[in-house]
Amino acid sequence: MKQFSTPIRRLEGVTYWVIEDPDGIYDFINTEIRKEWEADAESEARNAEDDLWLQTLSKRRWSLEIVPIARIKLNPAIVNYVDPKSGYNFQEELAKRSLELRTGIKEFSIVIWPVIVRKEDFMLVDGYCRYTTLKALGVPKTYTYMGTI
């Protein structure tokens, strides 16, 4: 994998690590982030090879874009996910994680990555905690890695 720079950018008072080069974003998503999504599928007893989103990853072109938070849509299947066996409740865990991240951003200026959005419908596919936190902080725009077919 080629090395790409990850400069720091500030937007609306929030600091981001960003990859600006589309090839770098592609590599990052198709290696590092893909691993996370495959692990998520496995933990939910789904076959990652059957996941429609994962099947399109390598076909997507990626870009770094600034997007109004209000334009980003949430996937109800993700937001409402509950695993009755383990007791895991996505919304409850998200609320806890978002509070921690909000504190980190407000008090310590921690650096975050852009959220990942599917361009054809502006569906958020990764970064629910970052999105929720930014929305709670009243941040109107965010950096996104935008994927399009």
Specify the residue positions occupied by each region the protein language model found.
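An acidic, glycine-rich, mixed-charge low-complexity segment common to nucleic-acid enzymes
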Residues: 1-71, 81-92
